[in-house]
């Protein structure tokens, strides 16, 4: 295929290919190499047809992939993550964007006010709720763009937003993995050459103090980063390393090689120790009564630098001096921190974005990024902090609590990684044609520092213990839950409280999780549940939604409907209000034989159940069952009953209570938590053609 030699993209591709081939053999003639590359391009180049659709003007045009790519270079539309193109902000006013910016600015203002209050105070909580509502308002616009009933609906906006967010978060994720964990893999030799091209053009002057690296050292390191082993690749990598200068080999070797860069260069490790030495160690106070004595104890503190002359003002000053906010380092270390950051940005960080970074999120092993949420990367820095503490600080705690030293080291790393995140996101923004005056709006801030984190098996499910929030110390170290079912409305308040107690007592408080202690506690709790049910206490039972039967296409399939109707049949003078949230009790009264005991002891109840349930004509207690080519109705019997708050399970029904299923259902919300600790479960209970009482039972078996 004949290639367009005036194409911007084609020329960029050829230029990079020529540079790569010359790295294999610098003695080659550059003009001849370029002609060779052009010839290969003509032989291999593919330019598929594409369709351009403008859903605002209802225009559709045909083109080729290359023509579209070159058009984006010339006209610079905003490029979304799924290939949707938008008119640039400097070409037309976007009222919706302004609306979102105003909402987010309001949120930022509320958060700033929130952090002036004492964490946990009513004022703090109220402002936290308000800023959260602003966030939901902004997010609701995104939801509206995907709803056809919304004024904001656009068939491309929703996917464009979703996939752009994926691109942004995966851009940061791959950078974090590469920079902090040296976890970068090249899927082929072309990607390695592309990365080398970026690295060798990143620093204009390479300093002489960088440690010299041999050809073998660099070659082995680069080859270890290849996704697959290949002798031909190994030979090519060695030839490239041979043709690099001594300075270039050093530059390439230390890129993404953070720990080795620190350990090999005394001037870098000295900067880290100097930062720790020069932090002022001050104590926080609990009340305003302690303020005057603390000022007397520290006459070197200028009271004019305090925001207020009370405990809040003092503690704010202390937290800044202890470097608890990586975005606001104290003056005592600022120069050293900036210097260290420049070295790390120049000689460790690489401004590189893998083309398949979204794919890598799900398919490549991670070493640093523990959890990826909608707009968050949660990083594990424990390994780096431990290494610096042992090998750079050599155990010196500088006469302060070791926890504060960990905060200092974490925030020293975070100061650097924040700069790296800003750089890679600014680069992504420029590639996406964001106007220069808008560069920087896309950013990633350091919001939380977790002391502990437990990650569930399902996506976006985790338990954390928070120490810092945007540089503010929360001395209570609260436990936060995300994604687990037990914090949802279907779990009773008593069970939610019990599970939180288990998590705090056996997972958060101990140095290592006490799995055996948790399982023993659960066994004792099972007996308490049985006793409470028998004595009329229903606080542990799961909650269901009691709604009108007209709200369901198949009401008989809803346990809440069957259970509510059964209660109302037995208690016509005390019916369950609709809608409401009664307690759900599992039963095992599948056949008339199961309720035979009622004939003599509870004859009126027996007659009602025979008529209204086992000879049901409403369809609530029956289900269609296929027999050959025909369908017949089969009775589901009594497999559940709803009990409103403040009422007891009817005495006649008590012998039918399925305690095992009830206990397993009550404890079901804790199973995902136990799975984190390796605790296994197995299915128990009956399944009939008309009902399913199968539940998962917790065992004392642990998977290693």
Language model segments and positions:
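Conserved acidic
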Residues: 1-704
